[in-house]
């Protein structure tokens, strides 16, 4: 059994994966410390792993959280941290979206930001890109203003390629303020809404981390293609890769002897 926790604002959205089925639980207030909540959840769970999605999952925040989990007595690897980009990929895999027919998009509207995540297939890889539209909607106050701003964002975000599936996630979508923009979204697309999306994606990834997922995936903090040199060797040009695709930029290193 795996438990996935997505922290958003003062709420923890939880999904439990057991024998291939993912169940959503009621959101709970986690108190002052997200990491302490994770530790308590892990210790209360008799077996399995914990998947965690932080809205601000920078390398330092994740490293500090991992060290705190180890100091509390949890085993290495018992808690797995995911970015929202990674969880977005998990959503697509869990829902079974067919990227060969079109892209999948997730509009994430929280108290602090408005971000669009696009998941698309590119040759043999799956690409996850994030675009921040917070500036375009943060000054909208009335329902009409937010609806108009969201409609403009939709036109910009979906201008490239074919998008067949859309998800709306976050507290910002509470209420019925987006009637005009929803009409534009639903033309030729499947549209779903829920607050447990990122938790369900992380639960799927955690459950299948050692499984059969074969599709290479890259997100916007990783390399999207091989990086290398073309060298002339024994009378012909050949490409020598230094860094493979899908590797974090900050951790990527490559060298060769000539």
Region roles according to the model:
Residues 1-25, 93-131:
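Gly/Thr-rich phosphate-binding beta-strand-loop-beta motif of the actin/hexokinase/Hsp70
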Residues 1-3, 76-109, 197-218:
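Conserved phosphate-binding catalytic cores of ATP/NTP-utilizing and phosphoryl-transfer enzymes
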Residues 22-42, 50, 136-150:
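N-terminal phosphate-binding loop and adjacent alpha-helix
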Residues 38-50, 95-96, 148-165:
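Phosphate/pyrophosphate-binding loops at sites that engage ATP/ADP/AMP, CoA/4′-phosphopantetheine
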Residues 41-68:
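Short beta-strand-loop/turn "lid" adjacent to the catalytic site in phosphate-handling enzymes
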Residues 52-61, 154-183, 190, 194-195:
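Glycine-rich phosphate-binding loops at beta-strand->alpha-helix junctions
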Residues 121-152, 205, 250-258:
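Glycine-rich phosphate-binding loop plus the immediately following alpha-helix
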């Amino acid at each position: 059994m795996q438990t996935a926790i997505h922290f958003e604002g003062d709420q923890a959205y939880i999904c439990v994966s057991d024998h291939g089925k993912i169940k959503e639980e009621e959101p709970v207030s986690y108190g002052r410390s997200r990491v302490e909540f994770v530790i308590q959840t892990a210790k209360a769970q008799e077996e399995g792993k914990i998947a965690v999605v932080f809205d601000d999952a920078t390398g330092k925040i994740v490293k500090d959280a991992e060290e705190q989990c180890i100091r509390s007595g949890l085993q290495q690897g018992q808690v797995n941290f995911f970015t929202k980009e990674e969880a977005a990929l998990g959503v697509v895999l869990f829902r079974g979206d067919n990227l060969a027919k079109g892209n999948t998009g997730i509009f994430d509207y929280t108290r602090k930001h408005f971000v669009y995540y696009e998941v698309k297939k590119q040759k043999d890889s799956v690409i996850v890109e994030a675009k921040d539209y917070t500036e375009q909607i943060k000054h909208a106050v009335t329902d009409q203003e937010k609806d108009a701003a969201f409609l403009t964002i939709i036109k910009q975000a979906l201008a490239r390629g074919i998008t067949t599936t859309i998800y709306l996630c976050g507290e910002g979508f509470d209420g019925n303020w987006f009637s005009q923009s929803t009409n534009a979204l639903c033309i030729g697309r499947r549209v779903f809404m829920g607050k447990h999306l990122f938790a369900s994606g992380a639960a799927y990834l955690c459950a299948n981390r050692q499984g059969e997922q074969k599709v290479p995936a890259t997100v916007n903090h990783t390399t999207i293609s091989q990086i290398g040199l073309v060298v002339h060797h024994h009378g012909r040009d050949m490409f020598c890769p230094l860094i493979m695709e899908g590797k974090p930029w900050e951790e990527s290193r490559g060298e060769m002897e000539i």
